[in-house]
């Protein structure tokens, strides 16, 4: 029999922003993890009580700029983050972790339970946003980010694409300027700019009580091996009653993964619904199933 027990304490500290006379904004952040673990009959761990203290120190600097015109307000925000962690990192190369522009500047961006990203690295990024003055829900947004490190770190999850000296370049574009059509595109390109490891294209159309959204997702190389198209369509009969249809097509296997048809009733106190689900396969087992 094997036995594993762990006690983990995490401490985060973020300083107040310091803004100089030229508008340069800086802050210092710490993330400390204290791990106490005990293992029995694990080949890769010593069978006794272990403790380890790890920490990341980060200096983050940005230079936010704003420009206003008659109809729009434009934001430009270049960022740089210097991180240092001298402690040793546990081998997490086989863990599944996704890095994108929503988490690349998080100090614990890998979200690993019992270890922290080690070594020295620079995270570079830039954000641009064009927003309507009269309606801030209508905007065009572009984000780019990448990671540079002193040396390769093979303990970092390989599918995160940030374990090499020059990581992938991560980006996303969102266009919400139209009343009825919203578009978003997310991508991850290798450092040589000759291979797209991940891209996702989303399109949403809404008119009155009708809304439909299509997503195309493709993963290649170190990120994964996925090629799917999915759709979610909904219609609100009134403020309480709606009908929802969902489906996903796996283009890699040339199979439909599922169809969902959902009737939903919703008020201030209650959400109730009836769901018909037809699944064509689950994971590696090609076992069709129907559920109501």
Q: Residue ranges of each PLM-predicted region?
A:
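Outer-membrane beta-barrel translocator/pore domains, especially the C-terminal barrels
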Residues: 1-292
């Amino acid at each position: 029999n094997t036995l594993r027990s762990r006690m983990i304490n995490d401490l985060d500290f973020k300083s107040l922003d310091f803004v100089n006379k030229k508008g340069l904004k800086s802050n210092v952040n710490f993330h400390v993890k204290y791990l106490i673990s005990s293992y029995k009959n694990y080949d890769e761990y010593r069978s006794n009580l272990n403790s380890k203290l790890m920490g990341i120190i980060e200096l983050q600097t940005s230079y936010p700029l704003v420009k206003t015109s008659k109809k729009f307000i434009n934001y430009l925000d270049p960022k740089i983050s210097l991180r240092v962690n001298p402690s040793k990192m546990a081998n997490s190369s086989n863990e599944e972790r996704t890095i994108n522009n929503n988490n690349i500047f998080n100090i614990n961006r890998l979200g690993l339970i019992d270890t922290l990203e080690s070594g020295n690295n620079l995270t570079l990024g830039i954000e641009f946003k064009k927003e309507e003055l009269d309606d801030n829900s209508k905007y065009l947004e572009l984000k780019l980010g990448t990671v540079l490190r002193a040396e390769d770190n093979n303990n970092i999850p390989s599918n995160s694409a940030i374990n090499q000296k020059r990581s992938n370049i991560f980006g996303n574009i969102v266009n919400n300027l139209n009343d009825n059509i919203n578009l978003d595109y997310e991508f991850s390109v290798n450092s040589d700019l000759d291979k797209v490891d991940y891209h996702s294209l989303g399109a949403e159309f809404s008119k009155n009580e009708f809304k439909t959204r299509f997503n195309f997702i493709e993963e290649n190389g170190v990120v994964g091996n996925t090629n799917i198209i999915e759709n979610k369509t909904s219609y609100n009969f009134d403020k309480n009653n709606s009908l929802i249809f969902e489906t996903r097509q796996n283009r890699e296997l040339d199979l439909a993964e599922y169809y969902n048809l959902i009737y939903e009733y919703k008020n201030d106190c209650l959400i109730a619904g009836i769901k018909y689900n037809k699944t064509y396969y689950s994971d590696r087992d090609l076992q069709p199933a129907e559920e109501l």
